[in-house]
């Protein structure tokens, strides 16, 4: 890779290319091929989908490099992989494997409860989760090229992704309405770096794409998140924990593209079989909420 490949402009541009698409979690080459054939713009290679990570408990780490390489060899679309928050070496290992993006992810057990990675030190672009403009701006300042809502992974429950997307967008509108001399106080109150807030105010949006993630389980869920302003959709457990992964994958891709065509979404939703089993958020203990990881 050349030095140009790792510049902020190129990293953000690579992420921008995924806009409007669906990124699917996969655990092997067969699932990766299903995702690609269904129209996914990228896949996320990991050992277990979030629902299985949640069910298993314990410590969840970076996937075995063999799985990542197997997925990379099976598809022509970009391949992402997750590292633990703050785990310098997992990130370097994934970079050495040649993945297209690294997700510093709260789905895995954090390695560092104080520091996130300085993503500017890496050639590969990073994806990070956020719940509000403070988290979004901090990750951007660290060098994230793509954001996504945290939602509540592995639950099949869209409510938290909706909450986070609405929160971020409401705060963007608030920042856009502030005078520049009011931004420093806003930065202090939210923990958002002042320079990033200035950029958000100037653009009227985040300077990087923001996808929906964490609870997307149906075509209607995907369309909902697009209508709320998502730039695209991550689907973790929703595809391969459903009754018919191939049908669900195609339907979610189509619904993401045609998110205002309600007749099409109705047609896509017919005869899909059962969606993944969902979890009511109020039944989760605080320590079971993955969205609380990171800051």
From Swiss-Prot:
PROSITE patterns: PDXS_SNZ_1 (PS01235), PDXS_SNZ_2 (PS51129). Keywords: Lyase, Pyridoxal phosphate, Schiff base. It comes from the Bacteria. D-ribose 5-phosphate binds at residues 25, 154, 215, 236-237. GO terms for biological process: amino acid metabolic process; pyridoxal phosphate biosynthetic process; pyridoxine biosynthetic process. It is an enzyme of class 4 (lyase). CDD domains: pdxS. D-glyceraldehyde 3-phosphate binds at residue 166. The active site is at 82 (schiff-base intermediate with d-ribose 5-phosphate). InterPro entries: Aldolase_TIM (IPR013785), PdxS/SNZ (IPR001852), PdxS/SNZ_N (IPR033755), RibuloseP-bd_barrel (IPR011060). GO terms for molecular function: pyridoxal 5'-phosphate synthase (glutamine hydrolysing) activity. It catalyses: aldehydo-D-ribose 5-phosphate + D-glyceraldehyde 3-phosphate + L-glutamine = pyridoxal 5'-phosphate + L-glutamate + phosphate + 3 H2O + H(+). Its EC number is 4.3.3.6. Pathway: Cofactor biosynthesis; pyridoxal 5'-phosphate biosynthesis. It holds the Pfam family SOR_SNZ. In the presence of PdxT, forms a dodecamer of heterodimers. Belongs to the PdxS/SNZ family. Catalyzes the formation of pyridoxal 5'-phosphate from ribose 5-phosphate (RBP), glyceraldehyde 3-phosphate (G3P) and ammonia. The ammonia is provided by the PdxT subunit. Can also use ribulose 5-phosphate and dihydroxyacetone phosphate as substrates, resulting from enzyme-catalyzed isomerization of RBP and G3P, respectively. This is Pyridoxal 5'-phosphate synthase subunit PdxS. It comes from Bacillus mycoides (strain KBAB4) (Bacillus weihenstephanensis).
């Amino acid at each position: 890779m050349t030095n140009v490949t790792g510049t902020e402009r190129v990293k953000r541009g690579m992420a921008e290319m995924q806009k409007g698409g669906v990124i699917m979690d996969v655990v092997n080459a067969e699932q990766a091929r299903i995702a690609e054939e269904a129209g996914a713009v990228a896949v996320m290679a990991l050992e277990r989908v979030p629902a299985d990570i949640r069910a298993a408990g314990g410590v969840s780490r970076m996937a075995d490099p063999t799985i990542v390489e197997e997925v990379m060899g099976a598809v022509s679309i970009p391949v992402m992989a997750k590292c633990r928050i703050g785990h310098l070496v997992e990130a370097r290992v994934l970079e050495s494997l040649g993945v297209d993006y690294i997700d510093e992810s709260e789905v895995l057990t954090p390695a560092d409860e104080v520091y996130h990675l300085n993503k500017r030190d890496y050639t590969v672009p990073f994806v990070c989760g956020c719940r509000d403009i403070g988290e979004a701006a901090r990750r951007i300042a660290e060098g994230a090229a793509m954001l996504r809502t945290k939602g509540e992974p592995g639950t099949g429950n869209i409510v938290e992704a909706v909450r986070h997307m609405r929160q971020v967008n409401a705060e963007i509108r608030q920042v856009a309405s502030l005078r520049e001399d009011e931004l420093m106080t806003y930065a202090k109150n939210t923990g958002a770096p002042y320079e990033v807030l200035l950029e958000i105010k100037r653009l009227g949006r985040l300077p990087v794409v923001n996808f929906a993630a964490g609870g997307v389980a149906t075509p209607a869920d995907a369309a909902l998140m697009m209508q709320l302003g998502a730039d695209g959709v991550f689907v973790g457990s929703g595809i391969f924990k459903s009754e018919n992964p191939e049908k669900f994958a195609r339907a979610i891709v189509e619904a993401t593209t045609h998110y205002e065509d309600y007749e099409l979404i109705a047609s896509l939703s017919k005869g899909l079989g059962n969606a993944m089993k969902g979890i009511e958020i109020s039944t989760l203990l605080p320590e079971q909420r993955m969205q609380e990881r990171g800051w």
